[in-house]
Amino acid sequence: MSSYAIIGFGCAGYQAARAIRGRDESGAIDVFSDVGLAPSNPMLTTYYTKGALDYTGMFPFGTLPQITEQLSIRFHGGQPVTGLDAKRRTLVAGGRETGPYDKILISTGASAFVPPIPGHDLPGVMPMRTAADAE
C-alpha cells in the first residue's frame, strides 16, 4: 500500500486527494493544513461578504467530515508543516515527525498581492482570499 502526504488543503490539495483516490483506492493519504477547515474557493469569499452566499457556500466541495469520509483521508488541521526531509520522506507537523511517505505534494497555495497604489494602506483596504478574510 502506498502512502501520500499533501501539504495544504485548498483547491489544489483537494483535487490532488481526489486524483490519488481515483487511482489508488487503498493508499493512505495524510493531509496537513494550517487551518481546520474544508477547502474553500477564494473567489466565493466576495459572494459571502455581500450576502449572496451563506458561510457554507464558500466550501463548494462539501464539509470537512464529508470530504474526509468520501476520500478516506486523515486530516491534520491546525498543524502546519514546519519541516520536510526529502531524503527520508518525512515531515514535521504539530511538533512531531510523521512518515515516511512514498509521495509528498506541496500545495500551500498563494498569497494575495496588494499593489503599491495610493490608498492601499488605508483602514478597511485589504486582500480577501480565505474564509477568515471574509469574516
List each language-model region with its residue ranges.
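FAD-binding core/adjacent interface of flavoenzyme oxidoreductases
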Residues: 1-5, 61-135
